[in-house]
């Protein structure tokens, strides 16, 4: 499966969204898969599950309704945004595995810079430990209310196993208190073809995240590589993420 990587630079969100839709609508079985890598001026985007009450105080930052999955997120300068435009039928895997592969590419990108990324069941995206983002400490799922009030698995940091210097852990009343979100994911699949994608925070002004409930979670902390002590340029992060996505999305 060949994949063309296109570096778009800094581009407005809405025309990029419209271009993704057009690309997907017009593509045929002969259309090569493509990976668009870009950066957006400040914008909030709402997913299909988004609720207006999660947009707390947008101010002068526009809010764009989209057809991707998920809830509200923020895009802005200093964030690498990657849009894989993939024919899953050609790729030979289904949506669940597609999401897993995107997350794995982000985890491997973070690992390249010495950071340990974590998945959180029921909360798509990638998270890091705020107390030690370079630690390999495990996370254990624990049933907690989801943003919609249903049960879901959210993380509790595990101390060492017996014999490793510690005891067991219990449910945390604030399961995200020790975690920060460093990458957000939201996709759309139309006629087995994907668009939208993933955003990795590199060196941003993080203040706009405080004006929303990111991904529908009130108080969820958002971090970037700079905040956790990793000095890397946008282009360096974009190049590594592009390479990892190209590799992990291959059949």
From Swiss-Prot:
Pathway(s) it belongs to: Protein modification; protein lipoylation via endogenous pathway; protein N(6)-(lipoyl)lysine from octanoyl-[acyl-carrier-protein]: step 1/2
Keywords, ordered alphabetically: Acyltransferase, Cytoplasm, Transferase
One cellular-component annotation, GO: cytoplasm
Subcellular location: Cytoplasm
Region (Disordered): 137-174
UniProt binding sites for substrate: 68-75, 184-186, 197-199
Domain annotation BPL/LPL catalytic: ranges: 29-251
Domain of life: Bacteria
GO process terms (BP): protein modification process
Enzyme class: transferase
Annotated active site: 215 (acyl-thioester intermediate)
Site positions per UniProt: Lowers pKa of active site Cys: 181
Reaction(s) the record says it catalyses: octanoyl-[ACP] + L-lysyl-[protein] = N(6)-octanoyl-L-lysyl-[protein] + holo-[ACP] + H(+)
Function (record text): Catalyzes the transfer of endogenously produced octanoic acid from octanoyl-acyl-carrier-protein onto the lipoyl domains of lipoate-dependent enzymes. Lipoyl-ACP can also act as a substrate although octanoyl-ACP is likely to be the physiological substrate.
Other comment: In the reaction, the free carboxyl group of octanoic acid is attached via an amide linkage to the epsilon-amino group of a specific lysine residue of lipoyl domains of lipoate-dependent enzymes.
PANTHER family documented for this protein: LIPOYLTRANSFERASE 2, MITOCHONDRIAL-RELATED, OCTANOYLTRANSFERASE
Family: Belongs to the LipB family.
Protein name: Octanoyltransferase
């Amino acid at each position: 499966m060949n994949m063309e990587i296109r570096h778009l630079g800094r581009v407005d969100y809405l025309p990029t969204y419209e271009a993704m839709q057009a690309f997907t609508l017009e593509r045929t079985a002969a259309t090569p898969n493509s990976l668009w890598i870009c950066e957006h001026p400040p914008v909030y985007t709402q997913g299909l599950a988004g609720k207006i009450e999660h947009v707390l105080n947008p101010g002068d930052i526009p809010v764009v309704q989209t057809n991707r999955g998920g809830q509200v997120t923020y895009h802005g300068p200093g964030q690498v945004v990657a849009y894989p435009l993939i024919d899953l039928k050609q790729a030979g895997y289904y949506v669940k595995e597609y999401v897993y592969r995107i997350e794995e590419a982000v985890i491997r990108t973070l690992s390249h810079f010495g950071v340990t990324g974590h998945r959180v069941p029921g909360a798509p995206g990638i998270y890091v430990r705020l107390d030690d983002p370079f630690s390999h400490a495990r996370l254990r799922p624990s049933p907690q209310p989801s943003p919609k009030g249903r049960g879901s698995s959210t993380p509790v940091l595990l101390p060492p196993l017996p014999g490793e210097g510690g005891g067991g852990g219990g449910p945390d009343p604030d399961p995200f208190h020790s975690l920060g979100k460093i990458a957000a994911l939201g996709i759309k699949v139309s006629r087995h073809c994907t668009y939208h994608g993933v955003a990795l925070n590199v060196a941003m002004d993080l203040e706009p995240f405080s004006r929303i409930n990111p991904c529908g979670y009130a108080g969820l902390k958002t971090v970037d590589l700079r905040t956790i002590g990793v000095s890397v340029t946008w282009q360096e992060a974009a190049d590594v993420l592009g390479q990892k996505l190209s590799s992990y999305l291959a059949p």
